[in-house]
Design a protein with these regions (language model features):
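Alpha/beta-hydrolase fold catalytic core
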Residues: 1-41, 62-64, 101-103, 183, ...
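Catalytic histidine-centered segment of alpha/beta-hydrolase-like enzymes
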Residues: 251-264
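Conserved HGGG/HGGXW glycine-rich cap/lid loop of the alpha/beta-hydrolase fold
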Residues: 25, 30-79
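Flexible "cap/lid" loop of the alpha/beta hydrolase fold
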Residues: 118-123, 127-160
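Conserved serine/cysteine hydrolase catalytic core
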Residues: 191-247
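Active-site loop/oxyanion-hole signature of alpha/beta-hydrolase fold enzymes
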Residues: 22, 30, 68-108, 112, ...
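Alpha/beta-hydrolase active-site loop signature
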Residues: 47, 71-75, 114, 139, ...
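Conserved alpha/beta-hydrolase catalytic His-Asp/Glu region
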Residues: 143-149, 156-214
């Protein structure tokens, strides 16, 4: 795992850091950029590592203090037996912010990281936030995502966990990616144990938990989605007083990679015009 992450180029001055959570778990993050600059904290999705945000680390670490977080059971963080539920995952983000000196941050959550970020807000409020960026997951708004059941008929042959994860990783992209990179992502994702991975896919809270959280946020919000969540983005834009939304129609789930230049430009504009001029 560590070898895989070392194969990816790191931003100049990027360093591996660790901290202990309030329940005694050692978690990892990548740190880059000037410590005195505004801090961006990137939270990855289900089973994904911090280094999936490498393009953002490279792009923003010249002018911003960039943190890419490995949640518990992911990347180079410890793999405890418990804590794979929203309250603990939100508390882990709170512990990370405390480890960074209790500074205010721009929190950027992608996929499951959206829910973990909203869990943090639900329990801790927005007092430590400069802004909130949420990428391609439901925020509890209407309409609820539609999940299509498997059509009737013979079940397809069962495949192993490695093949399933490899297929999942490749499904995140609409644009071609290097096979070595995809293999590294798959290898890293498989580090999350099956029981923990399953728990992360079934958080025991109602949809209103996420919706209640996002409507308590008074700081600027940027919500970027792919077309399946366009209606949620439209409703959030209409109902929330401090939100920007966008739909990336040609991107896969990992839109910050598939359309990295567009995303980095949009995030930079959000930082300059909404977050840092409050």
């Amino acid at each position: 795992l560590i070898l895989a992450s070392l194969l990816l180029p790191r931003a100049a001055g990027a360093a591996d850091r660790y901290f202990a959570t309030s329940d005694g778990v050692r978690l990892h993050y990548i740190e880059a950029g000037p410590n005195f600059a505004p801090t961006l904290v990137f939270v990855p999705g289900w089973t994904m590592p911090a280094w999936i945000f490498q393009r953002q680390i490279d792009a923003f670490s010249r002018d911003y203090h960039v943190i890419a977080f490995d949640p518990r059971g992911q990347g180079d963080s410890d793999i405890p037996a418990t804590g794979y539920e929203p309250y603990r995952r939100g508390a882990d983000i709170a512990d990370l912010i405390k480890a960074l000196g209790n500074r205010q941050v721009v929190l950027v959550g992608w996929s499951l990281g959206v829910l973990d970020s909203l869990a943090y807000v639900h329990e801790a409020g927005d007092g430590k936030l400069l802004g909130l960026v949420l990428l391609d997951n439901s925020v509890g708004e209407d309409p609820a995502p539609v999940y299509h059941p498997r059509p009737p008929g013979p079940r397809p042959p069962r495949v192993g966990r490695e093949a399933t994860m490899a297929r999942f990783v490749r499904s995140m992209f609409h644009r071609p990616q290097d096979e070595t990179y995809l293999d590294q992502l798959t290898e890293t994702a498989l580090r999350t144990p099956p029981n923990a991975a399953a728990s992360l896919l079934s958080y025991p809270v109602p949809r209103t938990y996420w919706r209640d959280a996002i409507y308590t946020v008074r700081k600027p919000i940027l919500y970027i989605v792919t077309p399946r969540l366009a209606a949620q983005a439209e409703n959030l834009q209409a109902r929330h007083t401090n939100v920007r939304t966008d739909v990336y129609s040609d991107s896969g789930h990992a839109l910050f990679i598939d359309d990295g230049n567009r995303f980095n430009t949009e995030l930079l504009d959000f930082l300059r015009t909404a977050v840092l001029h409050q």
